[in-house]
């Protein structure tokens, strides 16, 4: 069985990563599976454990980190976020294309460890910083000081976009998700052709 792709989607907080991912996942021909991150933060109202994130205590998270059980992990706004290593490898070995939706710091770590034609990195950017602020405030899930911290970090993170294979502007949900689907299909086809040549 052919090993699946690893697709890394990053972008600043509030850019719409989750919304775009959900739209991309509607295309079953891509054989995508979402890699669920582990976090110590509290769930938002609509989030479910084991679906949106694996929610754990800080003690549990730090124990797993000490045992090198994460492909990557990072600390952001008082909480830890990480990608369980064994979970991702199991899915890829089953031939599934694993989709990571992670913060930039975590993506840097993953991309330093995972290289090759079966890894795709995509950076999602907002059409403007003003639009990004509107989206974050529209969540109504965080106090103003956290929003300001997220916006300041977003400005720094956007400067990192050129380190990714692709940059996609999320100015329109359909257009952004279509572009990401094209990127994935192109890489799948390229790897199929390389396999046929062997």
Label each PLM-derived region with a short phrase:
Residues 1-4:
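Phosphate-binding P-loop
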Residues 11, 16:
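Conserved glycine(s) of the Walker
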Residues 17, 106-108, 176-177:
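Short, well-ordered alpha-helical microsegments
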Residues 138-142, 156-198:
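NTP-dependent small-molecule kinase module
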């Amino acid at each position: 069985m052919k090993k699946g792709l690893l697709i890394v989607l990053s972008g600043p907080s509030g850019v719409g990563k989750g919304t775009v991912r959900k739209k991309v996942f509607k295309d079953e021909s891509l054989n995508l599976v979402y890699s669920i991150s582990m976090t110590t933060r509290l769930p938002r109202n609509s989030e479910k454990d084991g679906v949106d994130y694996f929610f754990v205590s800080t003690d549990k998270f730090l124990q797993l980190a000490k045992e090198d059980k994460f492909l990557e992990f990072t600390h952001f706004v008082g909480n830890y976020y990480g990608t369980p290593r064994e979970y991702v490898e199991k899915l890829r070995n089953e031939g599934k294309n694993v989709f990571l939706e992670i913060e930039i710091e975590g993506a840097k770590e993953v991309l330093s460890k995972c290289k090759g034609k079966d890894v795709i990195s995509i950076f999602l950017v907002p059409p403007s910083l003003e639009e990004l602020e509107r989206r974050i405030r529209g969540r109504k899930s965080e106090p103003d000081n956290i929003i300001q911290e997220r916006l300041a970090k977003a400005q720094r993170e956007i400067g990192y976009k050129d380190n990714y294979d692709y940059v996609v502007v999320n100015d329109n949900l359909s257009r952004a998700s279509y572009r990401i689907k094209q990127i994935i299909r192109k890489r799948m086809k390229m790897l199929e052709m390389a396999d046929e040549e062997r």
